Curated annotation (Swiss-Prot):
Species name: Escherichia coli (strain K12)
Job description of the protein: Together with PhnG, PhnI and PhnL is required for the transfer of the ribose triphosphate moiety from ATP to methyl phosphonate.
Protein name as annotated: Alpha-D-ribose 1-methylphosphonate 5-triphosphate synthase subunit PhnH
NCBIfam families registered for this protein in UniProt: PhnH_redo
InterPro entries in alphabetical order: PhnH-like_sp, Phosphonate_metab_PhnH
Keyword Disulfide bond in annotation: no
Subunit field text: Homodimer. Forms a complex with PhnG, PhnI, PhnJ and PhnK with the suggested composition PhnG(4)H(2)I(2)J(2)K.
Length: 194
């Protein structure tokens, strides 16, 4: 069995990462950095690995897309978080993928129900860059007036964000990661292409 390292100071590092994630989720579009790890569990980047170490546990099934799924990641995730790994995206609380995500995989993610909207999945999407893409205007909770971002996104994700095909409060929350940095776009955020 080959394992990757986790946080050096598990409690303090997880608390720090949680506070940074809370900032990102409560202030959509704000980029935060997670510096607790020296490296991610390849092919996962530092931010994705940190999010999983901070949020995943035995009650949160994790789905890893094929490009990001390997034995070392699986063993490390099971050992450090005890999170169950699932083979289908619709079973996941946390879905982890990269820009190769298909519309079918995205549409399979749980969006919750009217009775249990919190059952909607969180999609952790590794992107090439958090800048240099189409300019997006974010409005809504946690944003004073508007916030502009330009991450490089696959078309299916852009469509999901701008169309929001599910009535609120249903939907998915999105965390975009690149290296040790991330930004979040919760389902409460309204997104427009500029």
């Amino acid at each position: 069995m080959t394992l990757e390292t986790a946080f050096m100071l598990p409690v303090q590092d997880a608390q720090h990462s949680f506070r940074r994630l809370l900032k990102a989720m409560s202030e959509p579009g704000v980029i935060v950095a997670l510096h607790q790890l020296k490296r991610g569990w390849q092919p996962l980047n530092i931010a994705t690995t940190s999010v999983l170490l901070t949020l995943a546990d035995n009650d949160t099934p994790v789905w890893l897309s094929t490009p990001l799924n390997n034995d070392i990641v699986n063993q490390s995730l099971r050992f450090h978080t005890n999170a169950p790994l699932v083979s289908q995206p619709e079973q996941a609380t946390f879905a982890v993928t990269d820009e190769a995500i298909s519309s079918e995989q995205l549409n399979a993610l749980s969006t919750g129900t009217a009775v249990a909207p919190e059952a909607g999945a969180t999609l952790i999407l590794q992107v090439a860059s958090l800048s240099g893409g189409r300019m997006l205007r974010l409005t809504g909770a946690g944003i004073a007036e508007e916030r502009m971002i330009a991450p490089q996104l696959p078309e299916c994700i852009l469509h999901e964000l701008t169309e929001r095909p599910h009535p609120f409060p249903l939907g998915i929350d999105l965390i975009l990661t690149c290296g040790e940095r991330l930004l979040a776009i919760p389902r409460t955020t309204h997104v427009e292409v500029c």
